[in-house]
Amino acid sequence: NTFKVSDKIKRGDFKLTKIDTDNQNRMSDIPFRVTCKGTGESHIIKTDENGYFSSESSWNAHSKNTNGGGAYDGLWFSSADGSAKVDDSVGAMPYGDYTLEELSCDNNRGKILYKGEFSIRRDKVTVDIGTIENHSEPTPVITTQASDAKTQYQIIKPSADTDIIDKVTITDTMAGRDYTITGTLMDKDTGEAVMVNGNPVTASQTFTSDGTKKVLDMHFNFDSSALGGKTVVVCEKLTYGDYVAATEEDMENKDQTIYFPEIHTTATDSETADHLTLADSRAVITDTVTYTNLLKGETYTLSGVLMDKETGKELLVDGEPVTQEMAFTAGRASGTKKLKFEFDTTGLAGKSFVVYETLTLEDVEVAEHKDINDEGQTIHIPAAQTTATDDSSKINVSEAKKEVSVTDTVAYRNLVPGKEYTVRGTAVDKETGEPLTDADGNELVSTAKFTAASADGSVDVKFTFDGTAMAGRSVVFFENVYYTDKLIAVHADIDDEAQTVHIPLIFTSVKDKDTDSHMSLAG
């Protein structure tokens, strides 16, 4: 007997049906990758509108748009040496082992993708893989807790080096899958991303899931200096590929919310109700502090210190800084508080000081207002110097005549420009220290009103009086400067030569060589 061994390769086919486990609906346009394990040859197939696929030529001819990857395209695997041509009379798959891997698409999004194997062993036999069901993936869950990385508070002082940490807990992810968590800071008022230097403030991390709970620290490092009074919400998004697996974007979620407080201050004198005070033994300055965006129910400490505007250092009175503080519990997110500073301003004429305020929560600074150039925080202590001259002699010597005219030039410093002031001068007998009076017994006074064009300047006050009775005596001109009828500067030095006009027994416009004064002895 003679036996003939055929070298014809066995070829077969396979078929499958795809359905959704949750609703038992057939799933169309689901792609699979079919790979021959022996040769590595690989092609894409796709289910039709009934969720069905068959490689049989009777269903879709192998020669029809061969390996096009569509639901109605033919499938053909060649031989190991690549010599097998497409033949609609035989099976699409040569003898061997194959893998079948479901590929992600919109129609199976959120489903657990199938991955399996099958074998072709018999010629002209179709392997029925059966019904492949898509079980839904577990839906990832995100929970977050945002706070300041340094203090762990959700209330943060605006600064150039803010570091917000969002502790993100992620559960129910698919083991082996690469995920990316991306966080964005959102302005709660506008619902838009917080922008710094034209860019949104974001943070992201990528991880490969092991199927267990994942906890990640998301750091947002940025300049929050401009966010005083703002509330921001940290929004997180979990993705794999271009698919959004989970989000935590609730703008009302307090755990995701960060508060940036803001304070503004206005300092005024208790007498003038303005930014002007008198150099006196007792000045009372009230600093009205307006705050916004505090956490209600928390207890805060408001601390103030007076700063010398000229030096930028703390203002010292009797060698000590001038400070004040108060504690309060915020009943509302926004409100006002008043700090009162009572201190001795004697010797501070001509100076300006600025009130600096700091707001703390349990010793952690959450807001400050420290602008040395902020006029609203500034108090000015005016100063005045006077120079009296006789209108006739042009020096501070007058003739003992019936009508003496004197001009007292008041040089002022440190006024607030644009405001109206009044200078009130009084002529005082240097010998008695009492004001001069006219024939009717009225004190000899003169006033001048002016609006200060600048902080420093001068104004003339005119005096006219009977000098006949003052021969051999001197008159000193005291000047007071008022703002809204409140005294803000005084120059009243009985021994100040510049304020003094002499009325000698014998009038001379030169100094006596023996007395070195404008007074000369008769005889």
Task: Pin down the residues of each PLM region.
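Solvent-exposed loop/turn and edge beta-strand elements of beta-rich ligand-binding domains
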Residues: N1-G523
